[in-house]
A protein has these predicted regions:
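Charged, amphipathic alpha-helical segments and their flanking helix caps
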Residues: 1-33, 49-169
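A short, hydrophobic beta-strand-centered structural micro-motif
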Residues: 37-51
Length: 169
């Protein structure tokens, strides 16, 4: 699996574990929260910190990376208990770090984790955010096992772009 495939597998494992615990918060890749999604939810991202040099396209590569998991929640009213709002966050951290659940087993090895500073976004609704950074290690490949779809000629792509631009004008 490539690093991006590992990242998606980690998100999937987290979402399945959260659903099994009865938690209604879901993890979305960074920048892809669907319209209509409600609080609470997670956004994740990853950053490669080290990739083993001199690997071939056939062999696996030892890769260190950070899995960043940000949690967003908002109180439905001023009377809401902040501690209760962060229960999905605490459950997710426990699911990921606990040797009993081991939700990322077979995908990546968790080396350590750290919390990011908490902050509040104020606007029409006060949004609370907490984050976790997981230092992970895994073996990745350079070749994706996901089928790329069908081939499309460059001329067809250019025609599609021109049509889209023409319709907007």
């Amino acid at each position: 699996m490539t690093i991006i495939e590992k990242y998606y597998a980690m998100n999937k494992a987290l979402n399945q574990a959260l659903a099994a615990q009865g938690v209604n918060a879901r993890a979305y890749k960074y920048g892809a929260v669907p319209k209509g999604a409600s609080y609470p939810y997670f956004q994740s991202a990853y950053r490669v910190t080290y990739r083993q040099p001199f690997a071939s396209s056939i062999s696996g590569v030892l890769t260190n990376f950070e899995f960043i998991l940000n949690f967003f929640t908002a109180a439905p009213s001023d009377e809401a208990n902040d501690a209760k709002l962060f229960e999905p966050y605490e459950i997710a951290r426990e699911l990921i770090t606990s040797p009993e659940s081991f939700i990322w087993g077979g995908i990546a090895t968790l080396l350590s984790h750290d919390e990011t500073p908490e902050f509040r976004l104020k606007g029409g609704l006060e949004v609370l955010q907490r984050g976790l950074v997981f230092a992970c290690q895994t073996v990745t490949t350079f070749v994706s096992s996901i089928h790329g779809g069908e081939e499309i000629a460059v001329d067809d792509v250019i025609d599609t772009i021109r049509e889209a631009l023409h319709e907007e004008v």
